[in-house]
From Swiss-Prot:
Quaternary structure (record): Component of the mitochondrial small ribosomal subunit (mt-SSU). Mature N.crassa 74S mitochondrial ribosomes consist of a small (37S) and a large (54S) subunit. The 37S small subunit contains a 16S ribosomal RNA (16S mt-rRNA) and 32 different proteins. The 54S large subunit contains a 23S rRNA (23S mt-rRNA) and 42 different proteins.
Descriptive protein name: Small ribosomal subunit protein mS27
Keyword DNA damage belongs to the record: no
Function: Component of the mitochondrial ribosome (mitoribosome), a dedicated translation machinery responsible for the synthesis of mitochondrial genome-encoded proteins, including at least some of the essential transmembrane subunits of the mitochondrial respiratory chain. The mitoribosomes are attached to the mitochondrial inner membrane and translation products are cotranslationally integrated into the membrane.
Subcellular location: Mitochondrion
GN (gene name): mrp13
Species annotation: Neurospora crassa (strain ATCC 24698 / 74-OR23-1A / CBS 708.71 / DSM 1257 / FGSC 987)
């Protein structure tokens, strides 16, 4: 295939896919200023942090990138214009922002502006407690005001870091408030990571009914946003959807999250002593499980594993789906998908839908074979291996 590196191929499942060849490209520093938007929200500020490193990273971005967006256009142009450098050194622009006097001297866009991705990542890695993570939405809001676009690799890192620290709801709120935060679901990896964590929190509760229903609502909310909210659409997403051949809201890998949680709820259908409301919920769970399973097998080609569903071109570029070919990453996402297929097949089979169960088993067998190849390539103790062993193998 043209443009594809033949060397260092990593084979996972039935395809040969290119291995990572270099570090992710850093987003270039922005060399132009944007006209400030009307302040419809409070001015971005940050809470007390747990470390001086985090405070420095946040304040650097606030002073150099965020606060200038609140200046009137003519003053903003002035502080970035070199011909006013000496004048501003003696007489800086002083303006009240959110009731506080702010002083602006000349800012050289090439040498004075911080590297946005580097500083955001530094801030993210320095966040330790709830107070630190509470600054995340304001940080992204400020970057959105300044038209700083997150590099392709950073959004999924934000989801992973915050959710690992227990802040799934913070991420979901940023997605809901996308107009303010600019935190979009435009990249395949970001969506995959978010759906993984929603399921993981339900799994950690042993799929208790309240937590599983809550998780199912959150997954459906994500799917609805992917289908109907144009703010989560972009050129990058359109390209990735063309490479996968699925719009995000119909991508089988994403729909498997809904199937997984619905299967866990439907498995409770035979519990005795249910109230009339619980019986109605159980009947709806069973009905939805059959509906979601039928939809999934229509979209998911027979005999195809996860990687085989998408085009070869999807795995060429780092900005697209190459992340999926890393064995331990593949195992993390495949674990809940495989659990969904197996559990759903078992339940619909018990309900008398034999042909549908057989189709689910067909997809499960393909995913399991692919996952076993990935499992053999990871070192003992790696995160992907542990997740796979716990979710699929039932290991505690």
């Amino acid at each position: 295939m043209a443009g594809r590196a033949p060397q260092h191929a990593l084979r996972v499942g039935c395809r040969a896919v290119p291995e990572a060849l270099s570090k992710p490209a850093q987003q270039s520093r922005c060399l132009s200023s944007t006209v400030p938007r009307q302040a419809t929200y409070p001015v971005v500020s940050f809470n007390k942090t747990s470390s001086p490193e985090l405070k420095e990273a946040l304040e650097t971005l606030r002073e150099k990138v965020i606060l200038p967006t609140y200046l009137p256009p003519e003053l903003r142009q002035k502080i970035f214009n070199k011909k006013y450098e000496k004048e501003l050194a003696h007489d800086p622009v002083t303006i009240q922002i959110d009731g506080q006097p702010q002083r602006f001297s000349y800012i050289n866009m090439l040498t004075d502006m911080p590297n946005t991705p580097k500083n955001i990542r530094a801030a993210l890695l320095s966040m330790k407690n709830g107070g630190d993570f509470a600054n995340l939405s304001g940080l992204l809001e400020g970057m959105h005001r300044a038209n700083r676009k997150l590099p392709y690799w950073l959004s999924a890192q934000i989801v992973r870091k915050a959710c690992k620290a227990g802040h799934l709801q913070l991420i979901l709120n940023m997605v809901r408030d996308v107009k303010r935060t600019g935190f979009t679901l435009e990249r395949h990896e970001t969506v995959n990571e978010l759906l993984f964590w929603i399921q993981r929190f339900a799994w950690k509760s042993d799929y208790s009914e309240p937590e599983t229903r809550k998780a199912l609502r959150e997954v459906q909310e994500i799917l609805d946003a992917l289908e109907g909210d144009e703010r989560h659409m972009s050129k990058d997403r359109k390209r990735q959807q063309a490479l996968t051949r699925f719009p995000y809201h119909r991508d089988p890998q994403f729909l498997a999250a809904r199937l997984n949680l619905t299967a866990e709820l439907a498995a409770r259908r035979a519990v005795t002593g249910q109230t009339s409301e619980q019986q109605l919920n159980s009947a709806n769970d069973v009905k939805n499980l059959v509906k979601y399973a039928e939809q999934l097998v229509r979209l998911w080609p027979a005999d195809k594993a996860l990687l085989d569903m998408y085009t070869d071109e999807a795995y060429v570029a780092r900005v697209d789906l190459r992340y999926l070919i890393k064995p331990q990453v593949h195992l993390r996402y495949a674990s809940f998908t495989l659990q969904a297929l197996k559990n759903a097949a078992k339940i619909v089979g018990q309900l008398g839908h034999g042909p549908l169960a057989a189709q689910l088993i067909n997809r499960a067998a393909a995913v399991e074979a692919e996952s076993q190849l990935a499992y053999a390539k990871v070192d003992d103790g790696m995160a992907g291996q542990k997740i796979y062993e716990m979710v699929v193998g039932g290991k505690k």
